[in-house]
Amino acid sequence: MQDEDGYITLNIKTRKPALISVGSASSSWWRVMALILLILCVGMVVGLVALGIWSVMQRNYLQGENENRTGTLQQLAKRFCQYVVKQSELKGTFKGHKCSPCDTNWRYYGDSCYGFFRHNLTWEESKQYCTDMNATLLKIDNRNIVEYIKARTHLIRWVGLSRQKSNEVWKWEDGSVISENMFEFLEDGKGNMNCAYFHNGKMHPTFCENKHYLMCERKAGMTKVDQLP
């Protein structure tokens, strides 16, 4: 462009530089970082949960294995202890054994302790006598018990078998009825014989007011493994 004096004037417009949106870039960066942190946190939580589940499963497994070993050890210990007790009985020197969970003068067999007492008592008195020792009158519910008791006493002894009336069924103290063919039951047809005693492998009904010796039974505890010979 030429001015009045003949000089050429250049009209140059300076371009303004584009402004960078600092706020927008900063916001995007924080979002990325927040997403990364969220993913890391979720991953840590999932990892901790998985670790916790694995830890519980491992503990349960080890506990189960330990219980199985303990149960197996107890079974072996029980059998061996009862073998030792039986041998002492066969030798006629029965004094019990330290491995037995039963008290002195109680016999250890199966899962129970058996007490043979020479006290002349009525059936009700015998029942109370056993109760006072945290036991019950003997219940015979399998053939092994029949043979075990038969081999260890030849005396008349009360057991926990009775009935309310002569026309009612015989029941054990826990309310269960006698099993068929478990033992020979000698019924003589006389009325009011509502209590039973055991003698030489057979069950006999008799009057509850009669006085006889008795047999008590209670659950055995754990075999004392550390006392085995």
UniProtKB/Swiss-Prot annotation:
GO molecular function: carbohydrate binding; transmembrane signaling receptor activity
Spans within the Extracellular topological domain: 55-229
Residue list for modification Phosphotyrosine: Y7
TM region(s), chain numbering: 34-54
Record-given protein name: C-type lectin domain family 1 member B
Effect the entry attributes to changing N192A: Significant reduction in rhodocytin binding
Highest taxon above the source species: Eukaryota
Name of the coding gene: CLEC1B
Keywords: Disulfide bond, Glycoprotein, Host-virus interaction, Lectin, Membrane, Phosphoprotein, Receptor, Signal-anchor, Transmembrane, Transmembrane helix
Motif position, ITAM: 7-10
Functional note: C-type lectin-like receptor that functions as a platelet receptor for the lymphatic endothelial marker, PDPN. After ligand activation, signals via sequential activation of SRC and SYK tyrosine kinases leading to activation of PLCG2. (Microbial infection) Acts as a receptor for the platelet-aggregating snake venom protein rhodocytin. Rhodocytin binding leads to tyrosine phosphorylation and this promotes the binding of spleen tyrosine kinase (SYK) and initiation of downstream tyrosine phosphorylation events and activation of PLCG2.
Assembly, per entry: Homodimer. Interacts (via cytoplasmic domain) with RACK1; promotes CLEC1B ubiquitination and proteasome-mediated degradation. Interacts (dimer) with SYK (via SH2 domains). Interacts with PDPN; the interaction is independent of CLEC1B glycosylation and activates CLEC1B.
Consequence of changing K190A: Significant reduction in rhodocytin binding
Protein's UniProt keywords contain NADP: no
Main localization, broad class: membrane
Biological processes per GO annotation: cell surface receptor signaling pathway; defense response; platelet formation; signal transduction
